[in-house]
């Protein structure tokens, strides 16, 4: 049985990681568009 607190921490870390990757990809995409790619 998984500890609810541990499960919450893991889910939170996963969400933050996915959000960070999405933001980084979005910013890189915007920078590429501004350069005329």
Swiss-Prot record:
Give each disulfide bond as a residue pair. Answer: none
Compartment(s) where it occurs, according to its Swiss-Prot or TrEMBL record: Cellular thylakoid membrane
* A biological-process GO annotation: cytochrome complex assembly
Question: What membrane topology is given?
Answer: Single-pass membrane protein
Instruction: Tell me which InterPro entries the record gives.
Output: Cyt_6/f_cplx_su5 (IPR003683), Cyt_6/f_cplx_su5_sf (IPR036099)
Query: What sections of the protein cross the membrane?
Result: 5-25
Under the heading Pfam families, the entry gives:
PetG (PF02529)
Q: Which UniProt keywords apply?
A: Electron transport, Membrane, Photosynthesis, Thylakoid, Transmembrane, Transmembrane helix, Transport
A single Gene Ontology MF term assigned here is: electron transporter, transferring electrons within cytochrome b6/f complex of photosystem II activity
| An annotated GO cellular component | plasma membrane-derived thylakoid membrane
Tell me which family the UniProt entry assigns to this protein: Belongs to the PetG family.
The protein's job, in short, is:
Component of the cytochrome b6-f complex, which mediates electron transfer between photosystem II (PSII) and photosystem I (PSI), cyclic electron flow around PSI, and state transitions. PetG is required for either the stability or assembly of the cytochrome b6-f complex.
Question: What binding partners and quaternary form does the record give?
Answer: The 4 large subunits of the cytochrome b6-f complex are cytochrome b6, subunit IV (17 kDa polypeptide, PetD), cytochrome f and the Rieske protein, while the 4 small subunits are PetG, PetL, PetM and PetN. The complex functions as a dimer.
Q: What protein am I looking at?
A: Cytochrome b6-f complex subunit 5
Gene assigned in the entry: petG
